[in-house]
């Protein structure tokens, strides 16, 4: 409601030709007419009240963001819905900061793990051996990407995760070094969708089964002490 409309509803209507009517009345009647008009001292209060109403009136346009807004949604909850896979600048990607259910060999990752080393005595094709190990240790595996890149041979597979979700396993094999990332695609958030709940233990257990099947060397911080 505009300020003008608010004032029209609150202030009394201005009498028409008041000056002319008063000139035709007796002095006593003029005094009676003047006593019926609102005191001038009330006008500032009425104007302030009208301003307060117009400023505090509920406006849906102000309270609800436009659906056509071009600003991206940047909450951790919405960010976790967009899973980025593939190499980043020729390297395995780090774990997203919004996803605690992840392990990566990228050194910038918050949940870091050392790359695997293929023993010199292992003469089998590493990609074929990796595929066989994934199929024998993981549930319902599906190989999404198998490609040769300038940075090594890249493998991406989807496997069964917790519940009805699918987890992602990525590997980059370059000579005898294997970088990887294992990540859950379903992230649970604590109200109000700013803190992710969980840890990387599930992915670490998945990797342990895979590494035991491969027989490749997996360095740890404990083994370096």
From Swiss-Prot:
Coiled coil: none annotated. It is found in: Plastid, Chloroplast thylakoid lumen. The keyword Transit peptide applies. GO terms for cellular component: chloroplast; chloroplast thylakoid lumen; cytosol; thylakoid; thylakoid lumen. Keywords: Chloroplast, Plastid, Thylakoid, Transit peptide. The keyword Thylakoid applies. It comes from the Eukaryota. InterPro entries: Thylakoid_lumenal_17.9. This is Thylakoid lumenal 17.9 kDa protein, chloroplastic. It comes from Arabidopsis thaliana. The lineage of its organism: Eukaryota, Viridiplantae, Streptophyta, Embryophyta, Tracheophyta.
């Amino acid at each position: 409601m505009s300020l003008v409309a608010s004032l029209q509803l609150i202030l009394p209507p201005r009498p028409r030709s008041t000056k002319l009517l008063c000139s035709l009345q007796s002095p006593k009647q003029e005094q009676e007419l003047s006593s019926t008009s609102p005191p001038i001292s009330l006008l500032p209060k009425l104007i302030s009240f009208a301003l307060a109403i117009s400023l505090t009136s509920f406006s849906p346009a102000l309270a609800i963001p436009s659906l056509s807004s071009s600003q991206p949604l940047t909450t951790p909850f919405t960010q976790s819905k967009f899973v980025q896979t593939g190499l980043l600048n020729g390297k395995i990607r780090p774990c997203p900061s919004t996803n605690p259910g992840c392990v990566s060999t990228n050194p910038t990752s918050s949940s870091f793990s050392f790359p695997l080393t293929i023993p010199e005595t292992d003469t089998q094709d590493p990609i074929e051996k990796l595929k066989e190990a994934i199929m024998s240790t993981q549930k319902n595996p599906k190989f999404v990407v198998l490609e040769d890149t300038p940075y090594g041979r890249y493998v991406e597979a989807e496997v069964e995760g917790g519940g009805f979700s699918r987890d992602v396993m990525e590997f980059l094999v370059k000579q005898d070094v294997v970088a990887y990332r294992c990540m859950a695609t379903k992230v649970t958030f604590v109200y109000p969708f700013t803190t992710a709940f969980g840890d990387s233990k599930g992915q670490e257990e998945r990797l342990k089964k895979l590494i035991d099947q491969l027989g490749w060397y997996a360095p740890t911080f404990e083994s370096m002490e």
